[in-house]
């Protein structure tokens, strides 16, 4: 499966030196930006173990990559604000990872997990209103179970774009580790802080 992972240049250096790279939680941008990502990341790890197999010894968190960006399965446009705003030199590493070693999910709907929200997955407003009413009527203990089960809808990545529901526009990929032999191409980008 062709994917694109955005990493600081240091990751590319480590990958070239060691032949393999695993997420270092102490240096991972999103794990150190003031938000509490432990619970959602641990949930994703549990889903990966259930769906693609146990993590290798020593792996704590997965490597993240793009599969689909703005409805297209191609390298993300590094000129967009999301990428241009990064300080320091970064790399977009094009990789080919075996399909059975990758778990795909909808990046926009991943925010239901990140924010600890119930995800109804409704495709139209009436369905949403019914789902929300049924969810809100549940006892608190049951709500937690139903909410966590609802998050599994993020793995539905078939493109849908309606007035009420969208999925598949941005598809992210997670896998346990990155190896040098998976690399097809590296593109450098980024900037340094102004004075």
PLM-predicted stretches and their roles:
Residues 1-2, 9-34, 59-61, 70-195:
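Conserved NAD+-utilizing ADP-ribose enzyme module
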Residues 37-73:
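Short, well-structured hydrophobic secondary-structure segments
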């Amino acid at each position: 499966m062709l994917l694109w992972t955005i990493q600081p240049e240091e990751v590319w250096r480590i990958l070239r030196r060691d032949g393999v790279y695993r997420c270092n939680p102490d240096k991972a941008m999103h794990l150190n930006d003031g938000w509490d990502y432990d619970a959602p990341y641990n949930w994703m790890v549990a889903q990966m173990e259930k769906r693609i197999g146990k993590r290798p010894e020593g792996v704590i968190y997965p490597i993240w990559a793009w599969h689909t960006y703005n409805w297209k399965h191609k390298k993300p446009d590094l000129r967009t604000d999301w990428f241009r705003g990064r300080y320091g030199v970064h790399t977009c590493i094009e990789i080919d990872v075996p399909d059975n070693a990758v778990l795909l999910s909808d990046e926009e709907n991943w925010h239901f997990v990140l924010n600890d929200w119930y995800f109804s997955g409704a495709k139209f407003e009436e369905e949403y209103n019914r789902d929300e009413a049924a969810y809100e009527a549940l006892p608190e203990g049951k709500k937690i179970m139903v909410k966590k089960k609802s998050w599994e809808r993020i793995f539905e990545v078939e493109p849908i774009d309606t007035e009420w529901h969208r999925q598949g526009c941005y598809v992210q990929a997670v896998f346990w580790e990155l190896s040098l032999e998976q690399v097809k191409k590296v593109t450098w980008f980024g900037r340094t802080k102004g004075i």
